Amino acid sequence: MNWLLPEYLADALPAEAARIERLRRTVLDHFRSRGFELVMPPMLEYLESLLTGAGQDLKLRTFKLVDQLSGRTMGVRADITPQAARIDAHLLNHQGVTRLCYCGNVLHTLPATISAGREPLQIGAELYGYAGIAADLDVIRLMAGAFDQIKLPIRRIDLGHVGIFRALAEAAGLPQEAEDSVLSLLQTKDVPGLIEACANVPSPYREALQRLPQLYGGADVLERAAAELPPLPAITAALEGLRHLLVGAPELPFSIDLSDLRGYHYHNGVVFAAYCDGYPAAIALGGRYDGAGKAFGRARPATGFSMDLREVARLVTVGKSNGAILAPHAGQNKHLAAHIAALREQGEIVVELLHGETACEGPLCDRKLALVGEHWIIEAIQED
């Protein structure tokens, strides 16, 4: 049984690996065309660097080990976002807007969802140095454009704002334990539990917290929220920011969910989640996390998104494409060798058989090179 992998870890076999690689190139090329520069952080870092500003969920998902050189505790990254924030704040040190993108494996102690693995291939983009809502809109459009490029339709994009709950909790004077309890109930939309937990919260904040799970749907939710929630400055600003996103990108399938508080201890502004048919959870997540670089010397405005490319690859419809071309062993035949090289230059996959090899068990070959007279031509391989 030595060949068994640990639970929720899997090999990517040739067909899946090829599909993932095509998607990776397509998405990174899309990011590059929008001015996002690629960075490649290491898999391992000192634990305090990986977990700076992170919530408790990321701490629990991070594998930990001892560095044999320094004796310090290290972590295997569970999220590349903090690493990108470190690069922006400490290494690049740009004064204006910085646009970064990345793609790499991360490792989780537990799967994030019932359908996810423990080694996602995380691909994403981050924008630093701009505090306005226009940056959030730019990142959301970048995400939507990536799905357009890989031809995976987005059914809806949920918008939320963690500042609304934070303002209510602060105004109500909730102690940390009570805030965490209410937060958990909101995330699961447990209305009876929420009513019970808020029983001793002063009015009007009690009613406002209890209303949050019902504040989801179309653009009209913002008007309902403005009428039903206390007119706290932070809430007014949050609703105005969400309204700006709806107006700024009417072509996108936006919906509002004011109780969506994923990443509450990490995000501090707009949050968003993209959903597509055939997948039970969000396929991409993002939001604003201003100040993430503070521990690295510079507190910068920041917003971005990421997704698991392995999960995305399972949802993308693969179009029919030509298989490989099977070629005989060229040996000293310079004419055949040149013809094979020319086909490869044209983008064809050509499998040249080794001396004595009669068939190829690798890429699916649907054509072959055959000598007709003095010329090598491509013929279809007839199935028996």
From Swiss-Prot:
GO CC, any one term: cytoplasm
Protein name (record): ATP phosphoribosyltransferase regulatory subunit
Keywords noted in UniProt: Amino-acid biosynthesis, Cytoplasm, Histidine biosynthesis
Family that this chain belongs to: Belongs to the class-II aminoacyl-tRNA synthetase family. HisZ subfamily.
Gene behind the chain: hisZ
Organism, as annotated: Dechloromonas aromatica (strain RCB)
Subcellular location: Cytoplasm
Pathway: Amino-acid biosynthesis; L-histidine biosynthesis; L-histidine from 5-phospho-alpha-D-ribose 1-diphosphate: step 1/9
Main location as per UniProt: cytoplasm
Membrane spanning residue stretches: none
PANTHER family: HISTIDINE--TRNA LIGASE, HISTIDYL-TRNA SYNTHETASE
More info: This function is generally fulfilled by the C-terminal part of HisG, which is missing in some bacteria such as this one.
Primary role: Required for the first step of histidine biosynthesis. May allow the feedback regulation of ATP phosphoribosyltransferase activity by histidine.
Domain of life of the native organism: Bacteria
GO annotation terms (biological process): L-histidine biosynthetic process
Subunit organization: Heteromultimer composed of HisG and HisZ subunits.
